[in-house]
């Protein structure tokens, strides 16, 4: 069974496939394996055939695409060749540019070398000049010293008998009248035969001439070098032409080589002609500019000659002024004494000024201390005012918030009141309606119940209004609550009233509305309580602010009492008064606002019209407050600005005060130094005076000789004190003179250095002037030579112009013929290029169409193969379905699995069917596209036929053009014969042109060199003019400086010599005073020895007196004892009288000795 079923299945599949392929002949079961094998071979062969066709199509396509592949390589090759040519041209240009730059740099290096050589030469000249000037200055200084040593010296005899000579003391000689002028011949002062500068400048001129000759030789070498460079450039041009010919041969397609070479020759000829024209124009312009420069140089020569004459005259004037300077020196010596006297006066005035400044400094320090205290107080007041302003701003912000809050409450309450009024109206209307309705219906039953209910509602409304007004009036009594009374009064006759159902519903609604109104009133009462608490807070803040304002006012008054001294305090007081007034006004406005708020709170819920008016008033007040707030802000800004100004003024005053303090400190230091010196001198004086007083006290106790010595010592002490005072004064004057001497010496050194530098600059400028003169003469000679050369060159240029005109005419005729031929050739080439481009485009379109057709055929074959494959799959699937049906019959147990498989296979079948449908639709579309492509191919073929017709016509035109070209070639042969003759002429012209070009280049080089030299000369002339002007100014300044320096030198020299002499005199005086003081000290020591001897003698006399007294008393007692009278004792009185003066002196000495001892102890 299985074998038969397999054979049947194979037969059925094979039969289907044969039917699909169109083989509908009968098939026997016996031939089934053969046919199956043949069928498989057929399928294999068809697939191999299809693969072969595909391979063949691909190879054909690739062979067709070879040209298309090669085309970009060809274009790339052409582009690379073109870029190579461009790079080669760029290389040639870069080489030319490099050679040009190297030539320019070499020329510039040569120019710099020449300039450096010139500068070295000038430097050597200047060094030699400086050395000669230094030698001259050394000789002059030695001569001045010799003359000063030969001057008569003043001799001063000191008190010790010594004689001292004072050097550099200039002796003065007064003459009554001058010597009479000589009547003989006076030689002119201008003649200066032995001038060393002229010889030096002539040598410089000779050296310059030699350098210029060397430069001429160098320029000749440069010309030869330039000619060699021109030859090198010609060789480069020839090599470039050869390279162009090589590249033209290398190029494929395009224009013929002859046409390109002709164009290149024409372009080069045009460039040469344009270059020659430019050179001719440039030469004409250079000739004009050179003529103008020659004229300007002649004018400059005249001006330079006039300036030289002026300078020579100026030289004479300077010589005369030197003589005048010598005369001024004598006057300066006279002026010096006056200067010294004035210096002494100024010293005294300076001392007085120092004392006055000390007093002023003390006053300024007091002022500074007061100002600092004022500033500290002002800063304190400023901080307080700033804090008050901040508090006021905070209060304003709070008030604004309150006002906004009240406005919102006002709006909300207005809305509630309007709603309540509307509800009252509706209630009244309802009640009237109900009254009318119930009155009509139930007059007998309840005639006045509604009226009583309405009256109770009105009473409740009035009660609530009264309660609100009472709360508004009370303001702060929030503990009591009117709600129990309302609640006790409100339900008045609710239980006893019974009506209909409609009336009950309306009454319940009214009761609900009443309860809602009561809740609203309760909320409003709470809101009023909040407002009252806020008002309390505001009142507390107002009290606090008022207390702070009072404190600030008290502080301001205290500051006002303290700050009543200066303008700054006055300003601060004014600002403070303004701020106080503003604060009072702000507080008044704040109180007014609070009163208004109270009034607004008290009359908040009375009537709508009153509330509207009140809100309008509040808005106006708010606007006023905003305006006032803006004014306050403006005033605050003004106060801030004034504060800034005051701070700036304080800073300026503080800076001034700091400067004053620094100056005061400096003056204090100086005054302290002077005070220390003064105190030292006073101490020394007090010590000396004290010593002298001690000495006088000691000498007063001595004998008459000691009295005489005391008088002498007193005289000497007075003389010594006066001498010490003089010594102090002299020391001060010496110190001041030393300082002045140092300053004068520094000034003299500086002026001498500046004089030396100025003299060097003068000599340098004279040398440059002489060099400029020489260069001007050289330039004049060179200009004359150049004018001669230019005249000859102009004649040569005129002949060359005539030759160029002839050659240009011939070239114009040849160029016209050539341009005609070129135009025809270009036109033909353009036509050919357009035809070739069109043909290429048509071929490309044809190729694209064929490629698309092949692709479509391949797609159709692929679709057919896919359809066959899908059909075979469908057949296989159908066979499988049959097998599955047979299995379903045989195997019932696996029915569920098979059903699932069937469902899957059905889904696959459906998808395959959908794919087949889509493939059918695609096949139809492809057929349509193939038909369209066939139509397009037909159209392209028609277009090709038309293009072929055009090509044939173009071929005919080309044949005609070839005939014309042959005729043109014949004409060309004749033209070439003519061109040969023209070329011979051109060769001759080229040879003459090369000569002319060489001559022109040499002339251009020479002209450039001459123009460069002329520009250098012009710049040098301009520089010389500027230098002459500046030198004139410097000469004038130097003259004034020389005169002033010489005067100052004379003054300083004279003052220094006199001060030195005075210093020596003072030193001698000091030595004398020292010797005197030493002698006095020796005398004082001798006197002290004598005093000690006298004291010993006085002690001996005291002892003798005591012994005598004792003996006298004893004698008296003995005489009394013996009975002698007192008269008898008178006989011994001469002894006592003779000795009477002596006892007095010892007693006095005894009395004075302890005093002296006490004085000595005090001194110790």
From Swiss-Prot:
Subunit structure: Homodimer.
Protein name: Centrosomal protein of 135 kDa
One Gene Ontology term from the biological process aspect of the record: centriole replication
Region (Homodimerization): 13-66
Disulfide bond annotation, renumbered to this chain: none
Compartment list: Cytoplasm, Cytoskeleton, Microtubule organizing center, Centrosome, Centriole
Alphabetical list of SUPFAM superfamilies matching this protein: Tropomyosin
Domain notes: Coiled-coil domains are critical for microtubule binding via the formation of a two-stranded coiled-coil structure in homodimers.
Residue stretches in coiled coil: 77-153, 202-423, 454-649, 673-1041, 1084-1118
Source organism, top-level taxon: Eukaryota
GO cellular component: centriole; centrosome; cytoplasm
Annotated organism of origin: Danio rerio (Zebrafish)
């Amino acid at each position: 069974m299985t074998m038969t079923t397999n054979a049947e299945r194979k037969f059925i599949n094979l039969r289907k496939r044969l039917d699909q392929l169109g083989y509908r002949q009968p098939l026997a079961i016996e031939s089934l394996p053969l046919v199956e094998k043949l069928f498989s071979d057929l399928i294999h062969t068809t697939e191999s055939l299809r693969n072969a066709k595909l391979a063949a199509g691909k190879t054909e396509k690739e062979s067709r695409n070879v040209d298309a592949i090669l085309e970009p390589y060809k274009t790339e090759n052409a582009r690379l060749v073109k870029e190579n040519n461009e790079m080669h041209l760029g290389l040639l240009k870069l080489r030319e540019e490099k050679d040009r730059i190297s030539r320019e740099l070499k020329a510039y290096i040569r120019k710099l070398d020449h300039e450096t050589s010139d500068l070295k030469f000038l430097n050597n000249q200047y060094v030699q000049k400086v050395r000669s000037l230094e030698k001259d200055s050394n000789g002059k200084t030695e001569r001045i010293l010799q003359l000063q040593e030969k001057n008569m010296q003043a001799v001063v005899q000191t008190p010790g008998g010594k004689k001292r000579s004072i050097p550099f003391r200039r002796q003065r000689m007064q003459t009554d009248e001058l010597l009479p002028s000589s009547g003989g011949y006076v030689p002119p002062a201008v003649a200066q035969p032995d001038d060393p500068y002229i010889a030096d400048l002539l040598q410089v001129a000779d050296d310059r001439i030699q350098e210029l000759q060397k430069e001429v030789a160098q320029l000749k070498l440069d010309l030869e070098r330039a000619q060699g460079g021109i030859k090198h450039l010609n060789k480069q041009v020839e090599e470039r032409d050869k390279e162009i010919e090589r590249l033209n041969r290398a190029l494929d397609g395009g224009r013929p080589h002859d046409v390109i070479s002709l164009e290149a020759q024409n372009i080069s000829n045009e460039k040469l002609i344009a270059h020659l024209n430019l050179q001719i124009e440039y030469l004409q312009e250079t000739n004009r500019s050179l003529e103008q420069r020659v004229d300007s140089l002649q004018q400059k020569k005249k001006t330079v000659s006039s300036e030289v004459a002026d300078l020579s005259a100026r030289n004479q004037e300077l010589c005369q002024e030197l003589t005048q300077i010598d005369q001024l020196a004598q006057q300066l010596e006279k002026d010096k004494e006056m200067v010294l006297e004035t210096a002494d006066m100024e010293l005294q005035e300076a001392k007085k000024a120092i004392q006055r400044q000390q007093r002023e400094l003390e006053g300024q320090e007091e002022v500074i201390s007061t100002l600092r205290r004022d500033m500290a107080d002002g800063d304190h007041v400023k901080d307080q005012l700033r804090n008050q302003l901040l508090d006021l701003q905070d209060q304003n912000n709070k008030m604004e918030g309150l006002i906004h809050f009240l406005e919102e409450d006002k709006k909300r309450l207005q809305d509630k009141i309007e709603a309540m009024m509307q509800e009252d109206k509706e209630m009244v209307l309802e009640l009237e309606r109900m009254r009318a309705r119930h009155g009509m219906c139930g007059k007998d039953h309840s005639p006045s119940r509604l009226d009583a209910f309405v009256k109770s509602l009105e009473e409740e409304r009035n009660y609530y209004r009264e309660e609100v007004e009472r709360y508004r009036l009370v303001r702060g009594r929030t503990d009591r609550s009117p709600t129990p009374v309302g609640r006790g009064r409100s339900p008045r006759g609710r239980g006893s009233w019974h009506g209909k159902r409609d009336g009950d519903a309306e009454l319940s609604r009214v009761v609900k509305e009443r309860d809602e109104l009561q809740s609203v009133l309760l909320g409003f009462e709470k809101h009023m309580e909040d407002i009252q608490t806020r008002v309390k807070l505001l009142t507390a803040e107002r009290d606090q602010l008022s207390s702070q304002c009072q404190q600030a006012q008290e502080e301001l008054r205290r500051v006002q009492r303290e700050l009543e001294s200066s303008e700054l305090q006055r300003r601060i007081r004014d600002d403070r008064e303004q701020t106080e007034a503003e604060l009072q006004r702000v507080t008044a406005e704040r109180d007014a606002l609070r009163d208004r708020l109270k009034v607004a709170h008290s009359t908040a819920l009375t009537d709508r019209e009153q509330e509207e008016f009140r809100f309008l008033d509040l808005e106006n007040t708010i606007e006023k407050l905003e305006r006032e707030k803006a004014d306050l802000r403006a005033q605050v800004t003004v106060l801030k600005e004034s504060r800034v100004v005051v701070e700036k003024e304080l800073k300026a005053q503080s800076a001034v005060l700091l400067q004053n303090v620094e100056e005061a400190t400096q003056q204090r230091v100086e005054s302290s130094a002077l005070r220390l010196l003064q105190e030292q001198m006073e101490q020394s004086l007090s010590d000396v005076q004290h010593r002298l007083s001690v000495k006088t006290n000691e000498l007063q106790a001595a004998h008459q000789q000691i009295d005489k010595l005391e008088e002498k010592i007193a005289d000497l002490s007075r003389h010594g004190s006066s001498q010490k005072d003089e010594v102090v004064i002299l020391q001060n004057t010496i110190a001041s003179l030393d300082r002045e001497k140092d300053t004068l010496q520094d000034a003299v050194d500086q002026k001498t250095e500046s004089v030396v530098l100025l003299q060097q600059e003068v000599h340098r400028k004279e040398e440059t002037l002489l060099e400029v003169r020489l260069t001007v003469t050289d330039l004049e000679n060179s200009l004359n030579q150049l004018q001669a050369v230019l005249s000859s060159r102009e004649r040569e240029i005129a002949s060359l112009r005539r030759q160029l005109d002839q050659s240009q005419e011939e070239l114009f005729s040849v160029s016209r013929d050539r341009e005609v031929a070129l135009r025809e050739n270009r036109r033909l080439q353009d036509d050919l290029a357009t035809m070739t481009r069109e043909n290429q485009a048509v071929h490309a379109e044809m190729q694209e169409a064929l490629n698309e057709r092949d692709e479509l055929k391949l797609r159709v074959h692929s679709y057919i193969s896919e359809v066959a494959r899908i059909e075979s799959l469908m057949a296989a699937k159908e066979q499988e379905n049959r097998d599955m049906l047979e299995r379903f019959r045989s195997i019932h147990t696996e029915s569920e699995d098979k059903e699932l498989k069937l469902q899957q296979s059905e889904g696959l079948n459906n998808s395959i069917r959908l794919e087949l449908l889509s493939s059918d639709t695609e096949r139809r579309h492809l057929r349509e596209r193939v038909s369209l492509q066939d139509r397009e191919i037909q159209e392209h073929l028609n277009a090709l036929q038309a293009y072929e017709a055009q090509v044939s016509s173009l071929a005919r035109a080309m044949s005609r053009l070839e005939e014309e070209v042959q005729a043109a070639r014949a004409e060309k042969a004749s033209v070439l014969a003519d061109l040969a003759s023209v070329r011979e002429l051109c060769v001759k012209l080229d040879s003459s042109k090369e000569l002319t070009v060489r001559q022109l280049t040499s002339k251009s080089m020479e002209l450039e060199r001459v123009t460069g030299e002329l520009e250098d000369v012009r710049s040098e002339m301009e520089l010389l003019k500027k230098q002459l002007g500046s030198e004139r100014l410097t000469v004038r300044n130097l003259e004034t400086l020389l005169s002033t320096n010489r005067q100052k030198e004379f003054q300083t020299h004279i003052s220094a010599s006199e001060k030195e002499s005075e210093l020596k005199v003072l030193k001698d005086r000091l030595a004398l005073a020292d010797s005197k003081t030493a002698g006095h000290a020796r005398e004082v020591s001798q006197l002290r020895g004598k005093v000690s001897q006298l004291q010993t003698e006085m002690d001996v006399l005291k002892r003798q007196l005591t012994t005598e007294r004792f003996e006298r008393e004893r004698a008296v007692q003995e005489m009394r004892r013996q009975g002698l009278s007192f008269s008898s004792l008178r006989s011994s009185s001469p002894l006592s009288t003779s000795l009477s003066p002596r006892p007095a002196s010892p007693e006095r000495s005894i009395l004075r000795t302890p005093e002296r001892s006490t004085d000595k102890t005090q001194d110790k």
